[in-house]
């Protein structure tokens, strides 16, 4: 399904850069837009909501502000690298405050409380109040988590998993590190006291993952907060959204809000643009989706999906 007004629309006079559309303005979409802008593309971000941010949006009411998504920053060097691509200094644009302790976990049903610290001996002292044996195992747990972080997370994080082959190559490493079994199983090897076990295995809940079902690769989250610290951005996480949006616009990109993408238009096996819910066609040579795989598939035209299914059956 492809209309001539979209498919054959030429570049504007004097415009020769490739056009790129990014669907969605969460951290992933904004980050992709910054990278595309740094590569010299003409970038447009299309956001369904009235303001950018996606799951990192905010609500302001009667003088109070709430972040609706993430509330803490880990691995801040990822933002450092991203902003540097556009010759910007992330730390000059967003004020980060290191947290100590990182956070506190409360169990209201029995009054237990546990503070998380970056300093390992101090953390062991806190754990020892609940279980000296588990406290003694904490350094070994962190070391095992470090190996997962460095050999699985960092190694895989910069790979494109466009087919099963790269994932298959990663499996031996995950098996060797015991990262392919559940996070709960992995943490259970080191901790038996229930509160400590829960505090070391809950990090997958950040992305809605059940510790008893997700792989132990998520144990890396426990290590990276010790390695890189846990930070709060002054003004909330939305301060980072604002800084990213500003960087995109300063690089010549555009962020269009209230722009609900209804379809990714495909011709000849390639995306050539999108069609908005109001019928407007937006042409581009590159289309990047920050939506989930399921929602992205729903955006592809029925004609394209039928053609792809027929080709796959041949």
Give the role of each language-model region:
Residues 16-150:
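N-terminal glycine-rich phosphate/pyrophosphate-binding loop and immediately adjacent elements
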Residues 108-214:
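Rossmann-like flavin
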Residues 220-276:
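Helical element adjacent to the flavin cofactor pocket in flavoenzyme catalytic cores
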Residues 1-3, 298-300, 305-307, 314:
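Short, small-residue-biased leader/transition segments that mark boundaries at the very start
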Residues 36-39, 186-190, 199-202, 243, ...:
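Generic, well-ordered alpha-helical scaffold segments in large soluble proteins
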Residues 16-18, 276-286, 290:
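Core beta-strand elements of the Rossmann-like FAD/NAD(P) dinucleotide-binding domain
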Residues 289-293, 297, 301:
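Flavin (primarily FAD) binding-site architecture
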């Amino acid at each position: 399904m492809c209309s001539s007004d979209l498919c054959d629309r030429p570049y504007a006079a004097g415009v020769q850069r490739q056009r790129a559309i990014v669907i969605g303005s969460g951290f992933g979409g904004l980050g992709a837009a910054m990278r595309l802008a740094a590569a010299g593309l003409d970038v447009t971000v299309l956001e369904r909501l009235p303001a950018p941010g996606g799951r990192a949006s905010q609500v302001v009411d009667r003088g109070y502000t709430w972040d609706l998504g993430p509330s803490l920053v880990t691995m801040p060097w990822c933002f450092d690298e991203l902003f540097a691509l556009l010759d910007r200094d992330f730390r000059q644009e967003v004020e980060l405050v290191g947290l100590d302790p990182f956070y506190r976990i409360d169990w209201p049903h029995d009054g237990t409380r546990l503070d998380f610290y970056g300093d390992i001996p101090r953390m062991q002292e806190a754990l020892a109040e609940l279980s000296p044996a588990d406290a003694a195992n904490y350094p070994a747990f962190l070391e095992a988590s470090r190996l997962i972080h460095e050999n699985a997370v960092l190694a895989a994080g910069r790979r494109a998993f466009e087919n099963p082959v790269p994932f298959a190559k990663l499996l031996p490493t995950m098996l060797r590190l015991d990262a392919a079994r559940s996070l709960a199983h992995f943490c259970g090897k080191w901790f038996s006291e229930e509160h400590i076990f829960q505090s070391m295995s809950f990090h997958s809940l950040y992305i809605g993952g059940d510790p008893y079902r997700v792989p132990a690769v998520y144990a890396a989250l426990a290590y990276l907060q010790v390695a890189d610290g846990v930070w709060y951005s002054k003004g909330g996480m939305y301060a980072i959204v604002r800084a990213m949006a500003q960087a995109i616009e300063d690089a010549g990109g555009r962020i269009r809000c209230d722009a609900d993408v209804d379809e990714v238009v495909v011709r000849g096996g390639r995306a050539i643009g999108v069609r908005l819910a109001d019928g407007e066609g937006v042409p581009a040579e590159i289309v990047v989706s920050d939506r989930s795989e399921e929602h992205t598939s729903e955006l592809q035209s029925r004609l394209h999906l039928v053609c792809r299914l027929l080709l796959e059956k041949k």
